[in-house]
Amino acid sequence: MNPREFISNLPDEILGKILSLLPTKLGVSTSVLSKRWRNLILLVDNFDLEDSSTSGFSAFLEQTVARLNTCPIKRLSLNGRHYRFSSADSWISTAFERGCLELHLQSQYLDTGILSSNTLVKLTLSDQIYLQGLVPHDGTVFFPALKTLSLGAVVADRDVYESLISGCPVLDELSIRDGCDDPPTWKKSVVNKSVKRLTVSFHHPMSAWAYEDNVWFKTQSLVFLDYSAFVSQGYTIVDRMDSLVEARLDLRLWVSTDSYDSDYEDKDFDVYRPYDVFGDVTSLVSGIRKVKTLHLSPDSLEAFFFCCNHMPVFNNLRNLSLESDEEKGWQALPLLLNNSLNLHTLSIKGLVHRVTSRCGDACACISERKTGMCCLSACRIKVLEITGYGGSFIELKQMRHFLGKLQCLETVRIGVERDGNNEHLRANLSSLHRASSECNIQFI
């Protein structure tokens, strides 16, 4: 049986599924093959419409919609910045009328009047979509069944933007990405009672004015938070995030902290003391204090130290994951360890960090005679995970410090870099003194 006969012998339902996987323009073109293929297009429920040219795209879509006026639509992906404003609204409305479950839109303009569907469960609005229309009333429900909402750099009035987020009463996952060269579009607030997973990326290094107001969160059902942005003036947590299980923070400072490393107790330091670091993350850090797993970027470690007036107690924290950078310090690490009494696992990607006078005794940057009681000695950490270990003198010194101070360690997992003499590195690490007799070193 040749391939052509094999395809022809497939059931209509299977051929319809195959056509749904093709770009819609290609799938529609098969209707010229025969009467059977002309009818098969009616089984397509997944439409991917894209064209970068101005000529023919609108006509093609209008003809397609007209031919498929009885077809159910499960998924619609619409990408075309050159078609008419009214045509796009018409196509989207048609998809909603036919029970569309998933909509991905990349266009120029969208009328807020059509943002209503009882069936839609996933919505993606890409960069530079302009939402236009009347401001919705308070309490307006746009999508009663929507579970996932993804917003690029969507341009809209504050009331429209915020109402779109709050108008999804069963929302599970919200993603906001705003970091292009154009002016900021995110309104720095998320208000939704049901959202469980929230991802925010807000990076505009040339628009410092956009960070001068507080960031608002009213997300009492939140379970997972991934927040990446330059630090703002402040943060307002309207309802406590008591349900939060995991948080990933990448909080970037606006200035280098090189000039802030001197000892504040130095009698001559006040003469040269630098200005306060912009931003206050105290409320944000306090808002996530019930978290069980916390991931911090190198910048976040510095933000926790310079922009947090009071470090809360993390009673529920079991897993702490850090990433190091040779230009960023570990100033906040002693505070975190002292306030995480039930910490079980400490994971660090890279041990090399900037040496400062503020790292405290969590690292080996300063001589032991200046530290007194080491914060590591009181830690109950049972698992230490180190990745990206290169075997340098500084790294070996830090490992000696960890193994010699952490008295409850049971397992140490070390990921050694591929370059270098691995056998020599392993031998050096295995020979280090261990404060815990139960400590077992594993190489991964």
From Swiss-Prot:
<dbReference type="Pfam" id="PF00646">
    <property type="entry name" value="F-box"/>
</dbReference>
<protein>
    <recommendedName>
        <fullName>Putative F-box protein At1g64540</fullName>
    </recommendedName>
</protein>
<dbReference type="Pfam" id="PF24758">
    <property type="entry name" value="LRR_At5g56370"/>
</dbReference>
<dbReference type="InterPro" id="IPR055294">
    <property type="entry name" value="FBL60-like"/>
</dbReference>
<dbReference type="InterPro" id="IPR053781">
    <property type="entry name" value="F-box_AtFBL13-like"/>
</dbReference>
<dbReference type="InterPro" id="IPR001810">
    <property type="entry name" value="F-box_dom"/>
</dbReference>
<feature type="domain" description="F-box">
    <location>
        <begin position="4"/>
        <end position="50"/>
    </location>
</feature>
<dbReference type="InterPro" id="IPR036047">
    <property type="entry name" value="F-box-like_dom_sf"/>
</dbReference>
<dbReference type="InterPro" id="IPR006566">
    <property type="entry name" value="FBD"/>
</dbReference>
<dbReference type="InterPro" id="IPR055411">
    <property type="entry name" value="LRR_FXL15/At3g58940/PEG3-like"/>
</dbReference>
